[in-house]
A protein has these predicted regions:
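N-terminal glycine-rich phosphate-binding loop and ensuing alpha1 helix
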Residues: 1-79, 100, 116, 136
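Conserved beta-strand segments of alpha/beta enzyme cores
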Residues: 24, 94-96, 179
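Structural signal for conserved beta-strand scaffold positions within catalytic alpha/beta enzyme cores
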Residues: 27, 97-99, 152, 182-185
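Well-ordered alpha-helical segments embedded in enzymatic catalytic cores
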Residues: 33-36, 108-112, 182
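Short loop/turn motifs at secondary-structure junctions
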Residues: 45-46, 118, 146, 179
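Conserved beta-loop-beta/alpha segment of the NTase-like Rossmann-fold superfamily
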Residues: 62, 69-75, 80-172
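Catalytic-core segments of class I nucleotidyltransferases/pyrophosphorylases
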Residues: 123, 141, 145, 172-202
Length: 202
């Protein structure tokens, strides 16, 4: 099973914290955001991850690579728990990279991975969004297998918040599953077709 993780954005909403480091590498507790995303993919059976990066994102590649010097230092220091944690990062999945040479948006970032996934179904996980539950990707896969086509994860938001998200219009075909008829990006509160917001899992 394959996944594409777009991580090429400039992170301007998080300035100045992202001036010199990728937003995907901002820490949440003791791990960078993107590690949670790759862990979520791996927990859903993904073994092949393509991360779409851009200029200034080398830290992402270094994070998922082995660090022999660090591992040796931890081993000499008998920091067994930290050694295990550091080694586990590079064993989460086979991680590949492709660079989006110019910022052309999310759709283009996913398209950069087209030759990698070929004609197989694949997941897309935004590299700066943490999903608190691990059942999202299995549910997306289940809906895809039963209905075919592309599947997007949505979550209800407060009506006053719809202008911050892409929102779907559609008909509910079974509890929790909608056939999407339209996507509206950041609608005005009074023009939103629903309160079901897209949150970065496809």
């Amino acid at each position: 099973v394959k996944a594409i993780i777009p991580a090429a954005g400039l992170g301007t909403r998080f300035l100045p914290a992202t001036k010199a480091q990728p937003k995907e590498m901002l820490p949440v507790v003791n791990k960078p955001i993107i590690q949670y995303v790759v862990e979520e993919a791996a927990a859903a059976g993904v073994t092949d991850v393509l991360i779409v990066t851009g200029r200034g994102k080398r830290a992402i590649e270094d994070h998922f690579d082995r660090s022999v010097e660090l591992e040796q230092l931890l081993e000499r220091s008998r920091a067994t728990e930290q050694l295990h944690e550091v080694c586990a990062i590079s064993d989460l999945a086979d991680v590949f990279y492709v660079r989006q040479k110019r910022p052309r948006g999310l759709g283009h970032a996913v398209l950069c991975g087209a030759s990698h996934v070929a004609n197989e179904p694949f997941f897309v996980l935004l590299g700066d969004v943490i999903v608190p539950r691990n059942d999202c990707l299995p549910r997306l896969k289940d809906v895809h297998e039963r209905y075919g086509g592309s599947v997007v994860a949505v979550s209800p938001v407060e009506p006053a918040m719809v202008s911050r998200y892409g929102v779907i219009a559609g008909e509910e075909v079974e509890p929790g599953v909608w056939r999407v008829t339209d996507l509206v990006e950041k609608p005005a509160v009074n023009e939103a077709p629903s309160t079901l917001a897209i949150f970065g899992r496809y």
